[in-house]
C-alpha cells in the first residue's frame, strides 16, 4: 500500500481558521492600545494647558480670551506654553459632537475669572469617562452640559 505524505484539507482548514482568529484578536488589541495611547496624550495635554492657564491667571488676574491649537499662550513678557497642543489623530475618538471631536475647545467666562476646556476620550479612563469631559480651574469632569459655542 502506498502512503501519501502531507496534510489533509481538514487539517489545513483548521490551521487557517486558527491563524485568522489570532490575527483578528491581535488587530483588536492593537486598536484598543492605540485608543488608550491617544487618550493618555489628551489627558496629559489638558493637564499641561491647565497648568499654563493657571500661571497666566496668577500673573494677569484673568484667563486668556482664547486659545488656538498650534499657537502659543503668552502675554507681553512671558510665554506660558510655546505650542498649544492639537488633539491626537484620529480626532473622533469618543463620538463627541461637532468641534469637540476635532480639537480641544476652550472658552473663557464673561468676567475672565474661569474657563471651560472640553476634550473627548475614546474610552473610560478613571476618573474620566468616554466622550466629552470638561476642565475648569476647580475640577475636571465628564459632562453632557457643554459650554455655549460648543457645537
Residue ranges and their predicted role:
Residues 24, 30-74:
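Conserved hydrophobic/amphipathic alpha-helical signal-anchor segments
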Residues 130-151:
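Low-complexity, S/T/G/P-rich flexible repeat/linker segments used as non-globular hinges
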Residues 125-129:
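Short, solvent-exposed loop/turn elements at domain surfaces
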Residues 2-30:
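N-terminal single-pass transmembrane signal-anchor helix
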